[in-house]
């Protein structure tokens, strides 16, 4: 399911680089990428049928539906400088965080854990996914392109107002705000230096990382009451890594 979402994402976003390598659509074209993504979706449901578990099918069917809703929501906000922080958070919950949540709940579900434990693991994954996506959006304005494995400024070129830019527009002076609005409307990647200056001036990267750390802390808090051990330590470490990677 995750791989299929990446194939479709790269087509929608017209991306040509992922994890430092050419995307499938850049090599084989959009049609092949969409069809292979569709195949992986259908294959995942074939595998679920083989498991013969209605709870698993219900969880993943709901999850894939919400991911699709998130992608549509994101499209509605492309080139929209009026995108609010609340709207941004709704998009990342649906397009990213719910897949994390499904993955973490599935482990509990497969092991026969009770409903309370499943809820804890689902909430952990949801908070982890939020933290991960915000940190990823920060990297689009701060990382080394080689280390990041994708082109810096892709979000800006696509007209996506992610949290750093949303915060900068809300806290810039009026003249800067109007210039930033125009950049978002045009999807003007050539204006990256001006955008970076505005983001730095407003402290927007620091603000965004604080928000990511808040969600990472909430993810760890969701684990309270679960048995200590290597698995719990790994989950706590993953929450911290999701935010600290590349920073």
Language-model-derived ranges and their functions:
Residues 1-247:
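All-alpha prenyltransferase/terpene-synthase fold signal
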């Amino acid at each position: 399911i995750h791989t299929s979402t990446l194939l479709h994402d790269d087509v929608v976003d017209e991306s040509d680089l992922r994890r430092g390598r050419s995307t499938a659509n850049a090599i084989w074209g959009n049609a092949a990428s969409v069809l292979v993504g569709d195949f992986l979706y259908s294959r995942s449901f074939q595998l679920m049928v083989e498991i013969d578990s209605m709870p698993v099918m219900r969880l993943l069917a709901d999850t894939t539906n919400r991911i699709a809703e998130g992608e549509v929501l994101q499209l509605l906000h492309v080139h929209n400088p009026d995108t609010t922080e609340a709207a941004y958070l709704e998009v990342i919950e649906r397009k990213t965080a719910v897949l994390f949540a499904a993955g973490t709940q599935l482990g509990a579900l497969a092991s026969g854990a009770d409903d309370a434990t499943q809820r804890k693991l689902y909430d952990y994954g949801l908070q982890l996914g939020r933290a991960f996506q915000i940190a990823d959006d920060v990297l689009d304005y701060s990382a080394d392109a080689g280390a990041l494995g994708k082109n810096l400024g892709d979000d800006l070129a696509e007209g996506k107002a992610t949290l750093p830019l949303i915060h900068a527009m809300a806290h810039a002076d009026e003249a800067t705000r109007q210039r930033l609005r125009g950049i978002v409307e045009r999807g003007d990647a050539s204006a990256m230096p001006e955008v970076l200056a505005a983001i730095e001036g407003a402290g927007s990267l620091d603000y965004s990382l604080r928000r990511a750390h808040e969600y990472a802390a909430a993810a760890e808090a969701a684990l309270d009451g679960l048995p200590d051990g290597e698995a719990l330590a790994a989950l706590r470490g993953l929450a911290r890594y999701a935010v600290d990677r590349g920073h």
